[in-house]
Amino acid sequence: MSTKNFRVSDGDWICPDKKCGNVNFARRTSCNRCGREKTTEAKMMKAGGTEIGKTLAEKSRGLFSANDWQCKTCSNVNWARRSECNMCNTPKYAKLEERTGYGGGFNERENVEYIEREESDGEYDEFGRKKKKYRGKAVGPASILKEVEDKESEGEEEDEDEDLSKYKLDEDEDEDDADLSKYNLDASEEEDSNKKKSNRRSRSKSRSSHSRSSSRSSSPSSSRSRSRSRSRSSSSSQSRSRSSSRERSRSRGSKSRSSSRSHRGSSSPRKRSYSSSSSSPERNRKRSRSRSSSSGDRKKRRTRSRSPESQVIGENTKQP
């Protein structure tokens, strides 16, 4: 069969023998070249495109021939001599890939592998972590635990039974039983009593000297305080005398003012009578108004009532 007239259709298979590699029709059960039977290992062929045929070639008016093929993925029409599509590089004849579903494609969940896990009552779980109920507890057979405890107790007893001579524990007792005559304990007591007496005497002397110095230091301070008190008393007496003199002068001034006012009041009718007799009635009115403005409304009334009387008195005085 010539390669030009060879056409691959769906279902054709390739011989599983690597040396042979012959492409057989889908209807054959054994290889046409080597005679090997068809097995599951044989890879199926898949056509990436189909020939357009004579009808479409005639419609193209000489642009395409009947052997040209159309791609199945992008529907581009390619020449017959091309083994791959000119647009998407899809092969004209390709091997059919096995669809296992592990890559996320078609038939993904058909053959699912389940991992069987057995729940055990052991100390650790499937991830190697210690279970909560076994945390903080010694897990193991009772016999093993007893053996461990027995070994620990035996080790402690052996440690206690070891030779203790190297530690020299009796040296303290020997030191307590030693001769204490060389230390003179009575002499130390006498020295302590003498020291206490001398300390008391020195304290009494220091207190007496301190009292004397304090009395001496207090004497100039007391004299200063006395002088200050005297100066304060003298200043207070002077201020009092000044205040009393001021009060006396003020009282005298007030008395003199009152007496002068009384004298003025007594002499006013005479002056008014003389002035009224000598001056005109207009002047008397002006004077009475000026006096009434200074003394108040009551004085105005008095001056008005007295003005005609003063004129009568003046006339009477003129006549002998």
UniProtKB/Swiss-Prot annotation:
Post-translational modification: Phosphorylated on Ser-310 upon DNA damage, probably by ATM or ATR.
Start-end of Acidic residues biased regions: 150-163
Zinc finger (RanBP2-type): 9-40, 65-94
N6-acetyllysine: residues bearing it: K18, K54, K92
InterPro entries referenced in this protein's UniProt entry, alphabetically: Znf_RanBP2, Znf_RanBP2_sf, ZRANB2
Chain intervals for the UniProt region annotation (Required for nuclear targeting): 151-320
Residues annotated with Phosphoserine modification: S9, S120, S153, S181, S188, S193
Pfam families according to UniProt: Zn_ribbon_RanBP
Major localization listed first in the record, in broad terms: nucleus
Subunit details: Interacts with the C-terminal half of SNRP70/U1-70K, the Arg/Ser-rich domain of AKAP17A as well as with U2AF1 and CLK1.
Described purpose of this protein according to its UniProt entry: Splice factor required for alternative splicing of TRA2B/SFRS10 transcripts. Binds to ssRNA containing the consensus sequence 5'-AGGUAA-3'. May interfere with constitutive 5'-splice site selection.
Protein name in the entry: Zinc finger Ran-binding domain-containing protein 2
UniProt organism field: Pongo abelii
Lineage: Eukaryota, Metazoa, Chordata, Craniata, Vertebrata
